[in-house]
């Protein structure tokens, strides 16, 4: 990272701490990840604003607060193996890869997946496996997962993702259409408990359509 980018990332982490993010490992990952790397040059000047930004293909890079919040919720359960549904720009994956031993990530838009893979390689993050496919179906061959994070809003909770959770595993997912709720779902053998965290706004999770 350049000195300017490092200063900007550190300042962003401080803003997120002021906004309620408490996990020091999450704040450290935010502070040392160059968010401008995950944006077009035309938007690089907005990289350290606490806002979602377009990345093309009708998709967005999530607001840093939401990235940090979802990561914090996941880390409370100390997951060893995590599935991310919706690689997008790769920014959320870059944060997670610094914090969990093994990350699997699925993206349905090939162009975004290729870019994300290149970015994480550039950051020397090598504990990440990438799949081009329908995130609604998860990644069965690599399951089970201690944690699953979905970075797009599902109209309903995908059964495939629930089935790929390990015992005691958690699913962090925005659910809903116009009004969306960020939910944490925990597996207890063959039953699940759910908790509403807060109201959020995400692009929709598309079922079965590759691009």
UniProtKB/Swiss-Prot annotation:
Catalysed reaction equations from the record: [protein]-L-isoaspartate + S-adenosyl-L-methionine = [protein]-L-isoaspartate alpha-methyl ester + S-adenosyl-L-homocysteine
Q: Which GO terms describe its biological process?
A: methylation; protein modification process; protein repair
Concerning InterPro entries, the annotation shows: PCMT (IPR000682), SAM-dependent_MTases_sf (IPR029063)
Q: Where in the cell is it found?
A: Cytoplasm
Name the job this protein performs.
Answer: Catalyzes the methyl esterification of L-isoaspartyl residues in peptides and proteins that result from spontaneous decomposition of normal L-aspartyl and L-asparaginyl residues. It plays a role in the repair and/or degradation of damaged proteins.
HAMAP family referenced in this protein's UniProt entry, alphabetically: PIMT
Example of a GO cellular component annotation carried by this entry: cytoplasm
Enzyme Commission numbers on file = 2.1.1.77
Record protein name field: Protein-L-isoaspartate O-methyltransferase
Its main localization is cytoplasm
Q: Can you tell which superkingdom this protein's organism belongs to?
A: Bacteria
**A Gene Ontology molecular function term of the record:** protein-L-isoaspartate (D-aspartate) O-methyltransferase activity
Similarity remark? Belongs to the methyltransferase superfamily. L-isoaspartyl/D-aspartyl protein methyltransferase family.
Give the top-level enzyme category.
transferase
**Pfam families the record matches:** PCMT (PF01135)
Active site, renumbered? 62
What UniProt keywords apply to this chain's record, in alphabetical order? Cytoplasm, Methyltransferase, S-adenosyl-L-methionine, Transferase
Record's SUPFAM superfamilies? S-adenosyl-L-methionine-dependent methyltransferases (SSF53335)
